[in-house]
């Protein structure tokens, strides 16, 4: 299961956001390092398409695809040198697929800021610099070990050696490999679990009042201008305190609560989950039956046998064909029987690239 690590400086609202995302009660305190061991929570990735398909057949079960969030303790300047239990926390980040970086864009005198000032750009750069410093040391050590093999003519060692020197020079200039390397180059160094080779999603934690008029939040404007300059997607805005309140309410109470606050169309938390999913180039295909209607996660660009393997390895090994219809065509037809009558169900082979939203029935044979 793919995962996102929620990181940031102490007291930016990470644990509050994590608690809202996973609906778990984790320790939240107004002092650094309230989180030491990473808390982990599994969340459903909501999907309106799946809900609509389920409404056609009323299955025994609806199974959403899932995503793992890890709440990693607040980092501080000097973490790469072990400050604030930094080495332990950085090791936790190496284990996740995506870094979800929470920055503080709200004013609150009751909640201390580790640097005594609200400056999300400065906060962002502190974390990024710590990631760079940690990777710089790791890569330097790796290059030292590879040098003799690379110089002896070992082709694989030389390829990695040359690439790591490029990455190291980039880090010296503050360039992260996730932004500069190709997908094939990133695969070459994947085993190193570089922090700076992981995709980053920026989440701006704002106040309740800010949500009503984000244009007045100077910290947020400064952050987004900086991200735009660095060619990083704009921050997703959330109010972790509102999200925490919402997570404790029943579904039917949530909209009433938001309406009372004047936030009828607010969906910050859902956008964080969806954005994490999309940042990793993840898509969903569906299986459809009376027993269950289910979403399955796959990487954009996977072929039919690879996607079949998400259900069971035997499906991939013995793949023959797949019956496919797009979810919206099936929903419009109201049933598989009607879709078949209209000739909308296609039979595809092993080279077919599954599309986001395909409804699939895999044919396989294992002897």
UniProtKB/Swiss-Prot annotation:
<dbReference type="GO" id="GO:0005737">
    <property type="term" value="C:cytoplasm"/>
</dbReference>
<dbReference type="InterPro" id="IPR031167">
    <property type="entry name" value="G_OBG"/>
</dbReference>
<feature type="binding site">
    <location>
        <position position="15"/>
    </location>
    <ligand>
        <name>Mg(2+)</name>
    </ligand>
</feature>
<dbReference type="InterPro" id="IPR041706">
    <property type="entry name" value="YchF_N"/>
</dbReference>
<comment type="function">
    <text>ATPase that binds to both the 70S ribosome and the 50S ribosomal subunit in a nucleotide-independent manner.</text>
</comment>
<dbReference type="InterPro" id="IPR013029">
    <property type="entry name" value="YchF_C"/>
</dbReference>
<dbReference type="GO" id="GO:0043023">
    <property type="term" value="F:ribosomal large subunit binding"/>
</dbReference>
<dbReference type="InterPro" id="IPR012676">
    <property type="entry name" value="TGS-like"/>
</dbReference>
<dbReference type="InterPro" id="IPR023192">
    <property type="entry name" value="TGS-like_dom_sf"/>
</dbReference>
<dbReference type="GO" id="GO:0005524">
    <property type="term" value="F:ATP binding"/>
</dbReference>
<feature type="binding site">
    <location>
        <position position="35"/>
    </location>
    <ligand>
        <name>Mg(2+)</name>
    </ligand>
</feature>
<dbReference type="GO" id="GO:0046872">
    <property type="term" value="F:metal ion binding"/>
</dbReference>
<dbReference type="InterPro" id="IPR012675">
    <property type="entry name" value="Beta-grasp_dom_sf"/>
</dbReference>
<dbReference type="GO" id="GO:0005525">
    <property type="term" value="F:GTP binding"/>
</dbReference>
<comment type="similarity">
    <text>Belongs to the TRAFAC class OBG-HflX-like GTPase superfamily. OBG GTPase family. YchF/OLA1 subfamily.</text>
</comment>
<keyword id="KW-0460">Magnesium</keyword>
<dbReference type="InterPro" id="IPR004095">
    <property type="entry name" value="TGS"/>
</dbReference>
<dbReference type="GO" id="GO:0016887">
    <property type="term" value="F:ATP hydrolysis activity"/>
</dbReference>
<feature type="binding site">
    <location>
        <begin position="11"/>
        <end position="16"/>
    </location>
    <ligand>
        <name>ATP</name>
    </ligand>
</feature>
<dbReference type="InterPro" id="IPR027417">
    <property type="entry name" value="P-loop_NTPase"/>
</dbReference>
<keyword id="KW-0547">Nucleotide-binding</keyword>
<feature type="domain" description="TGS">
    <location>
        <begin position="281"/>
        <end position="364"/>
    </location>
</feature>
<dbReference type="Pfam" id="PF01926">
    <property type="entry name" value="MMR_HSR1"/>
</dbReference>
<feature type="domain" description="OBG-type G">
    <location>
        <begin position="2"/>
        <end position="258"/>
    </location>
</feature>
<dbReference type="InterPro" id="IPR006073">
    <property type="entry name" value="GTP-bd"/>
</dbReference>
<keyword id="KW-0479">Metal-binding</keyword>
<dbReference type="Pfam" id="PF06071">
    <property type="entry name" value="YchF-GTPase_C"/>
</dbReference>
<protein>
    <recommendedName>
        <fullName>Ribosome-binding ATPase YchF</fullName>
    </recommendedName>
</protein>
<dbReference type="InterPro" id="IPR004396">
    <property type="entry name" value="ATPase_YchF/OLA1"/>
</dbReference>
<keyword id="KW-0067">ATP-binding</keyword>
